[in-house]
Amino acid sequence: MTDSDHRLPDRPGEGDPGRGRRIGIDVGSVRVGVATSDPDGVLATPVETVRREKSSDRHVRRLAQLVTELEAVEVVVGLPRTLADRTGPAAHDAIDVAEALARRIAPVPVRMADERLTTVSAQRSLREAGVRAKGQRAMIDQVAAVGILQSWLDQRRAALAAPGEGGHG
């Protein structure tokens, strides 16, 4: 068993790098959704969908390029644990991408955030907004990345506001 077999989500606010943009990433088998926050870490917005390449690391290079372009201080990758709170194949895949990205962008921290049901929630939001299933494919990964990052930002803000909690943000 490797460390990734026991990988749990990180807690927002721990080791917080302070003010600056964050990037949220939703790792899918075909596409990777990317979102970013404003420098104050209040609002997550979609950035782009990166095509996933199993045979190369081109998608990881593009993610690293976005971290540099957006001057991100922290990256949050969705960890899709099963509803039984286990690390399944999708979670191992996300961990592999996160670790490859972390090697490229050090010392910028890469965190793992619980993302159970994020894609389901994103699909529901798009459906309620009147986006047809066919049109959702192009947007779903970015919307899921926004959900992952917004949840992280909200939890981070609460953790940093709590007495004796969080980092130095």
From Swiss-Prot:
<dbReference type="InterPro" id="IPR037027">
    <property type="entry name" value="YqgF/RNaseH-like_dom_sf"/>
</dbReference>
<dbReference type="GO" id="GO:0000967">
    <property type="term" value="P:rRNA 5'-end processing"/>
</dbReference>
<keyword id="KW-0378">Hydrolase</keyword>
<dbReference type="InterPro" id="IPR012337">
    <property type="entry name" value="RNaseH-like_sf"/>
</dbReference>
<dbReference type="Pfam" id="PF03652">
    <property type="entry name" value="RuvX"/>
</dbReference>
<keyword id="KW-0690">Ribosome biogenesis</keyword>
<feature type="compositionally biased region" description="Basic and acidic residues">
    <location>
        <begin position="1"/>
        <end position="19"/>
    </location>
</feature>
<comment type="function">
    <text>Could be a nuclease involved in processing of the 5'-end of pre-16S rRNA.</text>
</comment>
<dbReference type="InterPro" id="IPR005227">
    <property type="entry name" value="YqgF"/>
</dbReference>
<dbReference type="GO" id="GO:0004518">
    <property type="term" value="F:nuclease activity"/>
</dbReference>
<dbReference type="GO" id="GO:0005829">
    <property type="term" value="C:cytosol"/>
</dbReference>
<feature type="region of interest" description="Disordered">
    <location>
        <begin position="1"/>
        <end position="24"/>
    </location>
</feature>
<protein>
    <recommendedName>
        <fullName>Putative pre-16S rRNA nuclease</fullName>
        <ecNumber>3.1.-.-</ecNumber>
    </recommendedName>
</protein>
<comment type="similarity">
    <text>Belongs to the YqgF nuclease family.</text>
</comment>
<keyword id="KW-0540">Nuclease</keyword>
<dbReference type="InterPro" id="IPR006641">
    <property type="entry name" value="YqgF/RNaseH-like_dom"/>
</dbReference>
<keyword id="KW-0963">Cytoplasm</keyword>
